Amino acid sequence: MNPERSERIEIPVLPLRDVVVYPHMVIPLFVGREKSIRCLEAAMDHDKKIMLVAQKEASTDEPGINDLFSVGTVASILQMLKLPDATVKVLVEGLQRARISALSDNGDHFTAKAEYLTSPEIEEREQEVLVRTAINQFEGYIKLNKKIPPEVLTSLNSIDDAARLADTVAAHMPLKLSDKQSVLEMSDVDERLEYLMAMMESEIDLLQVEKRIRNRVKKQMEKSQREYYLNEQMKAIQKELGEMDDAPDENEALKRKIDAARMPKEAREKTEAELQKLKMMSPMSAEATVVRGYIDWMVQVPWNARSKVEKDLQKRRQTLDTDHFGLERVKDRILEYLAVQSRVSKIKGPILCLVGPPGVGKTSLGQSIAKATGRKYVRMALGGVRDEAEIRGHRRTYIGSMPGKLIQKMAKVGVKNPLFLLDEIDKMSSDMRGDPASALLEVLDPEQNIAFNDHYLEVDYDLSDVMFVATSNSMNIPAPLLDRMEVIRLSGYTEDEKLNIAKKHLLSKQIERNALKEHELIVDDSAIVGIIRYYTRERGVRSLERELSKLCRKAVKTLLMDKSVKHIEINADNLKDYLGVQRYDYGRADSENRVGQVTGLAWTEVGGDLLTIETACVPGKGKLTYTGSLGEVMQESIQAALTVVRARAEKLGINGDFYEKRDIHVHVPEGATPKDGPSAGIAMCTALVSCLTGNPVRADVAMTGEITLRGQVLPIGGLKEKLLAAHRGGIKTVLIPDENKRDLEEIPENVIADLDIHPVKRIEEVLALALQNAPYGMQVASVK
């Protein structure tokens, strides 16, 4: 039957690859070719109508007139969206078939003269029969083809028009491009439906064959599972009859490993029971993999292997001194342990906790202790650990379970008595998964760690031979955990210690790391001191090492760029040329005695520093003002000092009503830096007395100590850092609380020798030493 012709149209043509669009179809298209994009723009500028025509060959990038089919679909552009990659996404709806009578290419895009194709009318009853037959056949096709959703059949049942039904069925069938194009070119609905039903019949036959093959495979799998089940039953019967075959080679290998591990009785019985269980399992089962993994861990853990511990004290002392300068308390504690160990055959390993700021050598000291004692070294980083299972392990009921990191590290190191470094123990935290700090209580208790129980191993493991060393930046550690460790504080290095560390360790390491030779770079002691004072502000030596590395890099650059330079010498005079402008400064003693100005001593996180305190008295009504970012404790210290002065006003020659007629202003310079603490109490009191009496304060005197309302001087902390700051700043005389005399044992001898240190008990002694003209006429002896 020939199709009926209708009106002629002139319309832009969009070539499509591997896609045939039917009437009533709504489909998104991604357009990337420039010519096609211009075609869409032309359609959008006109009536949003476009003709969609499939290419004969999808591989053709630039199709010509002869590369397109003659029949396509006139469509309406519903939406057009330009994408960031310069392509266009367009949503189109097919309207009606059309045949091209003339196709032209104007350079921008294809334009076609076409005419709509209309289908001849068919009898209504005949159409109903065709629709019903097609739907029934398509329903059978959907049942076999699981790729088409059942909702499609629901939508087909609502279609009464035979032509639209045929197009919808064709759109959902996996037809070749040529077959889809053939359906598009059939304007006769009767012919179109018959063609599609024939294609569906062919597809149904193929799908039925595929289903039979799938059923055969399924039966084969069921047969394999049945055979596996029967094999397991057979093994059980053989076990009852005592007719088990010889164990496979793998089981024999595991048995030999168990014998070689020399496990304690409990661990051996547990491991052998698991091995017997493994023999009864299929090697390919998931449970066998779990059991095999458990046995592997049990034979890897060191149950009896030990490394020989060094007992020669002189040799061990030499090792510690070679690796680290200073740190005498730690070295003495290690040597004490070695001394006792040389006399006692069985001694529990000490549990030390090295507490100190970053960069003072806590972690490297752990390595040095291991080297000195002859133990193997193993480190476990605890920073950020928040799961108890990291310590105790996971129970084997969990998929992918493993022992805790403690047992893993012991298996890795291979001996029972290593030095185990617990790094950053203060950085642990807890959450809903448990508290790892609480799990460590058992590990670090010498009375309990003889029977440490890992959840994965499920047997006791002896940790009493392990030498645990923990490191921490602060004392912010749970009290029960802290109670189990011997805390050794590592304060910041002194200037002399930093100089020696730089000369003996850091500089040579950086010279080697930067491929320099010893004679090519000479760094004078004055340059190293300059770096310590003016380019770093720390209690450790990390920044110092970075600055030395910077010197080495600049030296390498200079040597390579200027061949005439054979070696480089760096001293205090040319240090600025290599490291730039000085970043820091340190407090220095004032050169003149001043009224109302006192030099105090402060402790900071990076060491000690000089603290200047200024006071001024002006006519007023007794207002007390304090500035300089002072904390609450320091403000209260000023008020206490003022009360002490008022109580002694008559003896000091101060008018008794000064607090009513004068305003007093106390200022501590460097106002942007917060300051707090009670240790500036005697300095505040001295400054107030000097201001009110006009008696200057000696510029070469610095002081530290808390004051009470009765005028007593109370002890303070951080004495070592404060005295080092006084020594560095050129102070000659230092006043300290009498109760801090015991702390002078920790001060370097060269610092003690250069300072005139006076322990004081009362404010009267402080004023007698600090003021230019002693108000009481008394003398106070120094500690020398």
Swiss-Prot record:
ATP binds at G356, P357, P358, G359, V360, G361, K362, T363. Residues 11-204 form the Lon N-terminal domain. CDD domains: RecA-like_Lon. The keyword DNA damage does not apply. It comes from the Bacteria. The keyword Nucleus does not apply. Induction: By heat shock. Keywords: ATP-binding, Cytoplasm, Hydrolase, Nucleotide-binding, Protease, Serine protease, Stress response. It catalyses: Hydrolysis of proteins in presence of ATP. Its EC number is 3.4.21.53. GO terms for cellular component: cytoplasm. Transmembrane segments: none annotated. GO terms for biological process: cellular response to heat; protein quality control for misfolded or incompletely synthesized proteins. It is an enzyme of class 3 (hydrolase). Signal peptide: none annotated. InterPro entries: AAA+_ATPase, ATPase_AAA_core, Lon_bac, Lon_bac/euk-typ, Lon_lid, Lon_proteolytic, Lon_Prtase, Lon_prtase_N. It is found in: Cytoplasm. GO terms for molecular function: ATP binding; ATP hydrolysis activity; ATP-dependent peptidase activity; sequence-specific DNA binding; serine-type endopeptidase activity. ATP-dependent serine protease that mediates the selective degradation of mutant and abnormal proteins as well as certain short-lived regulatory proteins. Required for cellular homeostasis and for survival from DNA damage and developmental changes induced by stress. Degrades polypeptides processively to yield small peptide fragments that are 5 to 10 amino acids long. Binds to DNA in a double-stranded, site-specific manner. Homohexamer. Organized in a ring with a central cavity. HAMAP family: lon_bact. Belongs to the peptidase S16 family. This is Lon protease. It comes from Erwinia amylovora (Fire blight bacteria).
